[in-house]
């Protein structure tokens, strides 16, 4: 993805009002092939054509569980509406979110939903593709386990060509996303 496209996406994500904003991007933002490969590996179930991506961490007590519940709801609705949509939860906290922890965390979400655990520069590059930031509070050499993380609750819908097409708040805009799945079948064809 070009620096301009990344910058515009980051501006869109960061400039969104506190209350939700469901946005269909007029110019879809293409993801790098490496990012697309990672998403495909995270959700190999019958290779859904569309991907719904949310970022978070398993020790989050309020925002992430609701985001994941909404992700699961949308994936199930997409199945009912005959839209091939897979969900991917991307951990922003790989130090505490091991594969075992993430597997347990995402298993109740059902089929067509997986997780992605990346570390270091690979995670930073992946988050950068989406304009997502994560801020760690009180994480230091003396406190490597009991810290907080602040991150975006933005959800991203990636089309079969590997482009970000929809951006919305995973907490505030799930109703708009459900309406889009029910009423705009042509969009997903």
Regions found by a protein language model. Give the residues of each.
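N-terminal targeting signals for export/organelle localization
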Residues: 1-33, 184-189
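Structural microenvironment flanking redox-active thiols in thiol-disulfide oxidoreductases
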Residues: 68-126
